[in-house]
Every structure is written in C-alpha cells, then in structure tokens.
From Swiss-Prot:
This is Small ribosomal subunit protein uS7. GO terms for biological process: translation. Coiled coil: none annotated. Keywords: Ribonucleoprotein, Ribosomal protein, RNA-binding, rRNA-binding, tRNA-binding. CDD domains: uS7_Bacteria. Belongs to the universal ribosomal protein uS7 family. It comes from Synechococcus sp. (strain WH7803). GO terms for molecular function: rRNA binding; structural constituent of ribosome; tRNA binding. NCBIfam families: rpsG_bact.
Amino acid sequence: MSRRNAAVKRPVLPDPQFNNRLATMLVARLMKHGKKSTAQRILSDAFSLIGERTGGDPIELFETAVKNATPLVEVRARRVGGATYQVPMEVRQERGTAMALRWLVSFSRARNGRSMAQKLAGELMDAANEAGSAVRKREETHKMAEANKAFAHYRY
C-alpha cells in the first residue's frame, strides 16, 4: 500500500452553461483526448435535441435518466480459501452516480445513430423512460447481487 496521504477529493463545480454538477461529470466522461469544448458542444446539442423532442426541461430529464441508471448494489469478487465469491455490496452514492454516467456514455457510443449528440439524447430519453441499455445494465447488476445474496456475510 501507498505510504503517502490520500489525495484530497476536489469538489465538482457546476457546469457554466447548465449550472449543474451532473452535467460537469458527464462532460468529463464524454471528453476524449482532453477536448473539453467538443464534449460540451455534444452535451448542449443533445440537450437541445431532448428539448425539441420532449418539449420539457432537458436538465430534469437528464437527472431522471441518471437516477434510473444508478445501481444500489453491486457484486465484488472476494477470495476466501482458494474460492472466489461474488459478494453483493451496497454502492455509495458517488460511485453509483459515476457508474450510471459511465454506462450512459458507453451505451450511447455503442448505439446506431448519426452524431454522438443524437445517440446521447436517445440513450438519455430511454433511461428517463426506464428503458435503454444503461437501465438494463443496472437491472442485471441488481439481479447478480440478488443471486449471490448467500455470500453477503463475506462483506468486507
């Protein structure tokens, strides 16, 4: 283990355009090769598409989508006497949100569509309606934890 002190966690500042912390976190996940302005443009285009299609507030829809994709439990591998068990553990709120954003971005990239903004908008709208790949991934994670409930006493 490292002998240094743990790094101080920096606070996430709200996005300048949408005044939202989750938007800042999503821009960081969308960004490739340090191109932040491109990631911000993709997000603003996706939000404008969502606004056109739904007629509602895209920020509210985005927050609903993240909430619907956030897992509450996950399984972690734990070695006990030569056997590896999948131990279900509760997910801290920060980690759950980070996982949800990661899944939303990765499944957006995997979607068929023209631009990344359109793919992201589609995935966010699906997640807000409790459909889409990110929500399905969350359900799979919960099912896996439920199936391995017998190993919950190995929690560390």
